């Protein structure tokens, strides 16, 4: 097979973007050569822990340095702390960016789970991660101790990592009462208060009592979706905060009246404490020059006595943004590579069976039908936003979801009537299948509205994905119901067939499409693994990332795959029939495809956060985790839309893009989240 000049050019551009982006990201990850970054694994006592060790070039057993352990929050991994890791290590600190248990490359021993309930698998990972990492780092010869053997280690974590850090500080003081040695010298939590540590007995008063004269701080964002709440205010947590004026904030700072943010306070035990209050949201903390500057300033203050061992670089002097920028460049190359690889494969023997012929471009509807079509498209775009909160936060049987139950019943009855009419009047195979699709989609929509799903954590072992999966299957069935109803009521009368939706029932096209998707993803991930091995870089921007993973999560990927496959089959069919018209060629077709996939989430997020920043209370103040999760869904669904439109044009059907998107996005999602029972 001879590649066209365009294909060769696109392949070269993709590879150059990946290689150049990864190499430069790797350069800035090392602080422009100031540190060496390696991935390490060690026995943490409760399982296997992993992390990225940032070792200053002059640190060694003969020249030990103060150390800082940084870790991520729930559903993330070590790379989410790259800003702190890069900036602290280039200033001379030894830094361990830690994967908490059951995140990234770390895994909790199964015996540690108390049971298979959410609480039973959720509590052990963060309660133990930071404390276990402290024990490991204290034993390393390149980590500095004082003349009394006390460890010069700082602990910093975001969100659940912050809770883990708070517990590590408390546990260290308890352990020091017996050993006479404090291993942790100071700690800065980001995006966490004492809400969850109180579950294990460490509330604000206890943490204060166990301070032990340490230097401690908190980053408490003013618009944090979860924490730092005024206990006198009810009605949801997604609102403006002022933690220094709350009882817990004052207790932490040992003040009897509302304190000042960004101000150091001396404590009765000889320590110092500070609360920083950036005007940010929860996930904004770990993608912020301001918060990173706070971390730098905090540790420069905490370890001021050892300044001669460190580099005096101002907090505002930061380079981590370049690492993020070049990883984004590599991300663009990665997506390009996937599309180009799939296009090359379908020209090869066997794989070319994935193609079923070029789809004829349909005439765009005119007059009243055009208006009706755009109104239907608007509804299709809005529905995922309208039902996002009920599906994500309410769940089966909740009032909002029950609207879908009744809508599903109406659709199923309408589909059954259309089916009976098609049979009675002998309207043909298309009319019969259309009636069946409408009946089944409506019935299934009604069923999932009443049926609790993804509840067994022994099976659905990625808790953070379960609500996403429920919303996804709800969106898939809403879309399928609309597609079926429009076909029965409009499209069939216009002469449309399943070919217009990209639906081919040829077995070999389906099998070859699956094989094309699998081989494409294997090759693309091999490139990702190579970049990780060479440069310790992956492909990401903020919370959206394609990263390496362990084989232990493959069973979880396979369990969630059917849910996301259903969504991408329906999504690709909808994109195919709605963008393959004479008025939507080129960029306009891609734009509509993106809106069909990601328009709902974009609208929901815009309303949520514009309302939050303008009024101080979000449009949905009870949607904390779900609003954060939705941020990464925007690039996920947008990229999937581009892949769907590009590949249906090349194959003439939905199967290759649907399989590719489902496998790719499910793998990406599971690799970036907590997975229990690995």
Regions found by a protein language model. Give the residues of each.
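Short, Lys/Arg-rich N-terminal segment immediately upstream of the first membrane anchor
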Residues: 1-7, 317-321, 361-368
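Juxtamembrane/start-of-transmembrane alpha-helix segments at the extracytoplasmic/lumenal side
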Residues: 317-331
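Juxtamembrane interface at the cytosolic side of transmembrane helices
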Residues: 333-379, 423-430
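An N-terminal hydrophobic leader/cap segment in hydrolases
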Residues: 3-43, 50-53
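Hydrophobic core segments of alpha-helical transmembrane domains in multi-pass membrane transport
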Residues: 17-21, 334-340, 419, 665-666
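Alpha-helical transmembrane segments of integral membrane proteins
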Residues: 375-678
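Soluble extramembrane regions of membrane proteins in the secretory/endomembrane system
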Residues: 34-319
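Alpha-helical transmembrane segments of multi-pass membrane proteins
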Residues: 22-27, 303, 339-343, 382-390
């Amino acid at each position: 097979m001879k590649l066209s000049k365009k294909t060769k050019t696109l392949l070269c551009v993709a590879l150059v973007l990946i290689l150049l982006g990864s190499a430069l990201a790797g350069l800035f990850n090392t602080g422009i050569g100031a540190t060496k970054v390696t991935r390490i694994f060690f026995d943490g006592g409760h399982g296997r822990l992993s992390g990225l060790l940032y070792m200053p070039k002059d640190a060694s057993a003969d020249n030990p340095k103060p150390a800082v352990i940084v870790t991520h929050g729930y559903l993330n991994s070590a790379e989410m702390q790259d800003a702190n890791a890069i900036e602290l290590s280039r200033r001379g600190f030894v830094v361990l960016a830690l994967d908490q248990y059951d995140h990234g490359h770390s895994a909790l021993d199964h015996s540690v789970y108390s049971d298979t309930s959410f609480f039973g698998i959720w509590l052990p990972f963060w309660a133990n991660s930071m404390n276990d990492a402290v024990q490991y780092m204290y034993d390393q010869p390149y980590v500095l101790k004082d003349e009394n053997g006390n460890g010069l280690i700082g602990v910093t974590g975001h969100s659940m990592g912050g809770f883990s850090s708070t517990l590590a500080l408390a546990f260290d003081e308890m352990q020091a009462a017996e050993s006479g040695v404090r291993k942790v010298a100071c700690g800065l939590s980001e995006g966490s208060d004492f809400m969850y540590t109180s579950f294990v007995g460490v509330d604000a008063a206890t943490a204060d009592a166990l301070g032990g004269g340490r230097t401690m701080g908190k980053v408490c964002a003013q618009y944090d979706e979860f924490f730092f709440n005024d206990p006198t205010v009810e009605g949801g947590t997604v609102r403006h905060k002022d933690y220094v004026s709350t009882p817990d904030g004052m207790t932490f700072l040992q003040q009897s009246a509302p304190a000042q943010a960004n101000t150091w306070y001396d404590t009765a035990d000889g320590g110092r404490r500070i609360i920083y209050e950036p005007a940010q949201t929860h996930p904004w903390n770990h993608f912020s020059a301001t918060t990173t500057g706070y971390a730098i300033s905090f540790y420069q203050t905490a370890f001021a006595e050892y300044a001669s061992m460190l580099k005096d670089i101002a907090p505002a002097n930061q380079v981590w943004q370049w690492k993020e920028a070049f990883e984004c460049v590599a991300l663009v190359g990665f997506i390009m590579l996937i599309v180009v690889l799939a296009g090359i494969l379908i020209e090869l023997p066997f794989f070319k069976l994935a193609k079923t012929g070029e789809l004829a471009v349909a005439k765009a509807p005119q007059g009243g039908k055009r208006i009706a079509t755009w109104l239907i498209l608007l509804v299709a775009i809005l529905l995922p936003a309208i039902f996002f909160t009920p599906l994500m936060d309410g769940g089966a049987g909740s009032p909002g979801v029950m609207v879908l139950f009744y809508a599903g019943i109406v659709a199923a009855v309408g589909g059954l009537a259309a089916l009976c009419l098609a049979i009675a009047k002998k309207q043909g195979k298309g009319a019969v299948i259309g009636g069946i699709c409408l009946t089944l989609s409506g019935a299934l929509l009604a069923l999932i509205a009443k049926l609790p799903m993804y509840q067994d954590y022994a099976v659905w072992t990625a808790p953070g994905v379960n609500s996403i999966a429920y919303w996804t299957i709800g969106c898939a069935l809403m879309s399928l119901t609309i597609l079926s109803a429009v076909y029965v009521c409009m499209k069939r009368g216009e002469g449309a067939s399943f070919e217009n939706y990209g639906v081919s029932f040829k077995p070999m096209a389906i099998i070859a499409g699956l094989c094309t998707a699998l081989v494409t993803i294997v090759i693309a991930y091999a490139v990702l693994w190579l970049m990780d091995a060479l440069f310790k870089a992956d492909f990401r921007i903020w919370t959206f990332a394609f990263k390496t993973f362990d084989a232990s999560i493959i069973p979880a990927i396979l369990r969630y795959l059917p849910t996301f496959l259903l969504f991408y089959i329906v999504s690709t069919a909808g994109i195919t029939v709605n963008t393959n018209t004479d008025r939507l060629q080129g960029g306009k077709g891609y734009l509509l495809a993106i809106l069909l996939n990601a328009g709902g989430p974009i609208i929901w997020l815009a309303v949520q956060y514009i309302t939050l920043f303008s009024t101080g209370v979000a449009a949905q103040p009870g949607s904390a985790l779900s609003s954060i999760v939705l941020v990464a869904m925007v690039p996920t669904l947008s990229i999937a839309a581009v892949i769907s439109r590009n590949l249906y044009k090349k194959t003439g059907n939905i199967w290759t893009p649907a399989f590719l998107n489902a496998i790719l996005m499910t793998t990406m999602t599971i690799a970036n989240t907590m997975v229990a029972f690995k």
